[in-house]
Amino acid sequence: METIFAQSSAFGKAGVAVFRISGPKSLEVLQLLTGRKDFKSRLMYYQQITFPESGELIDNAMVVYFKSPGSFTGEDVAEIYTHGSKAISIMLINALLNIPNIRLAEAGEFTKRAFLNNKFDLTAAEGIADLINAETIMQHRQAIRQAGGALEELYNNWREQLLQIISLLEAYIDFPDEDIPDSILNKVNNTHTNLINEISNYLNDNRRGELLNSGLKLAIIGPPNAGKSSLLNFLMQRDIAIVSNIAGTTRDIIEGHLDIGGYPIILQDTAGIREESSDIIEQEGIKRAINSAKTADIKIIMFDAEKLDSSINEGIIDLIDENTIIIINKIDLIEPSKIFLIEDKYKCLRVSIKNNIALNDILKNIENIAENMAGFTETPYITNQRHRHYLKQGLTYLKNFTLDNDLVLATEDIRMTVRCIGTITGVINVNEILGEIFKNFCIGK
């Protein structure tokens, strides 16, 4: 196995920069860079880091050696903690590149080696990647649970039950003349039925985990001049959309990302929807607005209080669903006692973006819907499409299984289900998917 290295921290100005070395030459590399021969495992040392050939000082740093298998990768590992300087990073990388039989690590290669050395399964490796990419508290909580082995435990539990079914069926196949109690077949049937129900229910999760990973798309729609762009600017806390009294100012979709209650939200401000427009560009904007609303996880439909009755049309009303927030804006311009027809059928928020009236109610409603769609449950949920694909495939094999068929063929259906689950966790040979998974890591991890 080759010895690899990389800067594990971000390249640039920082208090500390971290370099990781993994492989059989790790200790030798550390000795060459420091001139020190005796390193005890897991003990931190303060050392000068120099070019091995010239002796030129690179930095005064903290270094540590981890003897295999007690390291992140399971191999001999050395770590160097320098000052966070671009110049220091460049010099140390050059020094490492000049040492024979050591190379720069590929993206995710340290984590890949840890997986290959049985430090964790593939789901935990993916959890580490999600943890690095997490931008909100809820994304962090999901990732830390997965990195800690929660999905591995769930999938392995199903796999063990399936292996038990196989062992019972093989007893029937190998010893057909033996008097095996019917209770054994009853146990097979019960376990099989329970697993179908569990996996089916698990898949029927409305993509909660994937939504949390990728972000919930929120489309702001409504007639022209209702205050959609003003709402976007309020939510983003900066002016990213042009606000104007001229109808049709927003022509294309304007997007922004934010954190509401720990949930990642992808905001989309859209063109005002109206039935009559002779402007070809505005017509295309309206078409995109409607498409955005149809694919959104959450919708905010905004109306101008002064023009509400005249601006409601069937195209907008048809977009309302359980994850829609209806806002009546510019409420400061009408009598408080005025009741709108739409309020008889739908719950509406009365706000004034301009005068900061009831704006926190908007945030709370968004958070409530996000929590309902992607909030935590006791059972860890599917976090990416790879898991969902193989679980669906495994469930198909599981549903094909019946004791009325030839037992050898029936057992093969269970084996294929085991293989699908093993592909998720990495229990079986999954070389063809390792590159796809680990390429999404950063260099140094």
Curated annotation (Swiss-Prot):
What's the encoding gene here? mnmE
> Subunit arrangement?
Homodimer. Heterotetramer of two MnmE and two MnmG subunits.
Annotated residues that bind Mg(2+) are located at: S229, T250
- Entry note: cofactor: Binds 1 potassium ion per subunit.
What role does this protein play? Exhibits a very high intrinsic GTPase hydrolysis rate. Involved in the addition of a carboxymethylaminomethyl (cmnm) group at the wobble position (U34) of certain tRNAs, forming tRNA-cmnm(5)s(2)U34.
Residues reported in the UniProt entry to bind K(+) = N225, S244, I246, T249
Q: Does the keyword Magnesium apply?
A: yes
Cellular compartments annotated: Cytoplasm
- Class of enzymatic activity (EC top level): hydrolase
* GO-annotated biological processes: tRNA methylation; tRNA wobble uridine modification
Q: Which HAMAP family match?
A: GTPase_MnmE
The superkingdom listed in its UniProt entry is Bacteria
Query: What is the protein name stated in its UniProt record?
Result: tRNA modification GTPase MnmE
